[in-house]
Amino acid sequence: MKNDTTVVIGAGPYGLSVAAHLRAAGLSALTFGKPMEFWRSMPPKLYLKSSWSALSISDPAGKYSLNRYSKQFGVPWQEPVPLQVFLDYGKWFQEQAVPEIDETYVASLSQDGDGFHLDLDDGRSVRAKKVVVATGIAAYANIPDNLGHLPPTLLSHSQDHKDYSNFQEKRVVVLGSGQSALEAAALLHEAGAAVELIARGPVVWIDRRLYYKTGPIKRIFYPPSDVGPPGVNWLVANPLLFRRFSDKMRISLDARAVRPAGATWLRPRVEGQIPTTPNTVITRAVERGQHAYLELSDGTTRDVDHIVLGTGYRADIHVLKFIDPALLGKVQERAGSPLLNEWFESSVPHLYFVGAPAGYVFGPLCRFVVGAKFPARQIARRFRML
């Protein structure tokens, strides 16, 4: 009997988008994962950096956009968008567009003849012909090499915290200058911690005046994807075009499109509130009892209770422990990013990657919710051909 089962691993914006497009096309798929789990682990008072127009999870007809949700439930347009609004919207999208989700985790994925074998956490197993890996960014937390030896009592990543109240009256260094670092610093300060922000570069704030003041003609400067500064944003808005650029140009555009920077609305909660040491790195970190002793590149030292990393994420499929090493070894990659064809298919037939791992080939759009539409559409189109 022919096995034609499709499995989507992950139920965040990318997994939900792929599953929604497949379902709308009449193509059945098993979707595994807890809906919006990564987003639900964030501090409840968080606001999102992306604009309202860039936060719709994708279904092919646009029936379940954020605007549709807003109109149906009387949720007013607002920027910045509160995390809770996005969580409520994501729950509604899943219930409408992908109602049948199995919240069991995939424990292992291996190759099985011309298909794949999946073992689930609850002891069940599934055989699939096609697999889409859409596991989000949580596994890719970027830990600097010279800090990774510190224990969890002294070192954590911003994604590890939903509540910072346990840091009240603690001395905490936040490392980084992007949105996650700046917001972590603000939340720590507001929770009563003695916070210092240390960044290898300057602290930069995103200037959105052109976006808000140009009215309808803003679309000349800003594509709907809204990723990157004017000029660069149009070059990264089309993933198929981005894929055609040379490696050197893709790397350059990616760096220019997504630089460490904070949303302007966060600025009053940081500037003048939190001591900041820019253009500085931690050169050495030593565990001393219950403290971390830090040596900085400017010659100064710190003795702190904890370090929170706001150092973002670095996609590397080798950290996906559920993928069998033998299968992973067959995936052609560049610095941990799979090399994908136009359908997001890896060098292993019928194994697809979406989201952050696809960024090397398709660009920085893959790191944002707005980027989910393109791979979902491509994969559904491809599966209809097979």
Language-model-detected regions and their locations in the chain:
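Flavin (FAD/FMN) cofactor-binding and adjacent substrate-gating region
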Residues: 40-72, 224-243
